[in-house]
Amino acid sequence: MSLVMISENVKLAREYALLGNYDSAMVYYQGVLDQMNKYLYSLRDTYLQQKWQQVWQEISVEAKHVKDIMKMLESFKIDSTPPKASQQELPAHDAEVWSLPVPAERRPSPGPRKRQSAQYSDCRGHNNRISAAVRGPHRPSSRNPNDKGKAVRGREKKDQQNKGKEEKSKSTSEISESEPKKFDSTGYDKDLVEALERDIISQNPNIRWDDIADLVEAKKLLKEAVVLPMWMPEFFKGIRRPWKGVLMVGPPGTGKTLLAKAVATECKTTFFNVSSSTLTSKYRGESEKLVRLLFEMARFYAPTTIFIDEIDSICSRRGTSEEHEASRRVKAELLVQMDGVGGATENDDPSKMVMVLAATNFPWDIDEALRRRLEKRIYIPLPSAKGREELLRINLRELELADDVDLANIAEKMEGYSGADITNVCRDASLMAMRRRIEGLTPEEIRNLSRDEMHMPTTMEDFEIALKKVSKSVSAADIEKYEKWIVEFGSC
């Protein structure tokens, strides 16, 4: 439960009460009291519980005052209604006093009539004279001055209505312009479209290029493949068209997925995060439809980057005895969509491109045709000594370090460690001071520790202990295998 939300709701309730909008104020007061009840149940500290109970009592008193005001206003409305006059209260009829005239009904004026006879007109004039004598002398109408005011008010009202209509139409047009474009799912299953739309990363992963240590060549290539074609669309045409596919190869934990997150953050393109579960279905023929739908949606939302992590699980080598017919059809559809006759057509505008960014730890299992379509195949190696030191600085930038910590010395000791291994070492070392502080304490004593007591600087000894506990996860034989493959099939 967010304390900021509770305070904001209390503020709104009080503002509505001050403005006289008591109905809205009561809604907010009721919501605040419910939120505070939930928060009270989650508290373990008795002192804090007492404080919050006092606050709850004060808020409930305020809500009661607002409720009393609402009741009082309601009683005013009931008392102010005039009582209907009964027949007995009417004054007695006096025979010598004329009764009030019955209000005449206004009827629409009839159309042109035929000329009436003289006899009828004489009778009508005679009757008019009698009625005029009965009514008395003619008096000037008292409604004339107000007619002008009514006309002015009518014009003002009409102007306000026209103005309101213009503002409404303007706001609706602005809303329609600000609304994101929606893919037309005609001809496709609605559930399939929604499943793929969920894989569009609309939230910002918040990973910048500076958050990735080393890997200068990989970052340069991704910028050239994704960012530059949008900045210089006139240049990237013909033979200089942007790369359609980039394959990142390397041992686990070297930053391949992190590079994809940086592309999603920095490149401002529509980013599809696709896995094998996204493109597989138990129904026959539906997986191929998913692949085709994915690329059609990517072209609609272009410029687009489709990131396929662990692509070897989707598009492994064809023709093996263990291959199933369904997976073979999915691979064929993926290859056609990437570079087929009816698939990835070359658009004249390079800013509307669709790029496939793939990552794998088993490049030797990928199909040859897919390897050809992934035009750039780059090796993401283990971090160098400079990269390891930079990684240590990035991971430890929020921690307080002791004066005896030498990051260059620690980086030398971590030769052969991947980026994920270095992060694990930093995490383990950062917890050492806390482990020493709570050793031998009861749970109640641990709960009562202050924040300053827990935030102690990490020492060089902590890193040495962490290095003994965390070993490297990549063997030298694996590194040799990756380097041999990249020498044979690499395209940096």
Curated annotation (Swiss-Prot):
Residues 80-186 are annotated as: Disordered. Its EC number is 5.6.1.1. It is found in: Cytoplasm; Cytoplasm, Cytoskeleton, Microtubule organizing center, Centrosome; Cytoplasm, Cytoskeleton, Spindle pole; Cytoplasm, Cytoskeleton, Spindle. ATP binds at residues 250-257. Residues 145-171 have a biased composition (Basic and acidic residues). InterPro entries: AAA+_ATPase, AAA_lid_3, ATPase_AAA_core, ATPase_AAA_CS, KATNA1, KATNA1_MIT, KTNA1_AAA_dom, MT-severing_AAA_ATPase. Pfam families: AAA (PF00004), AAA_lid_3 (PF17862), KATNA1_MIT (PF21126), Vps4_C (PF09336). Its main location: cytoplasm. Belongs to the AAA ATPase family. Katanin p60 subunit A1 subfamily. Can homooligomerize into hexameric rings, which may be promoted by interaction with microtubules. Interacts with KATNB1, which may serve as a targeting subunit. This is Katanin p60 ATPase-containing subunit A1. It comes from Gallus gallus (Chicken).
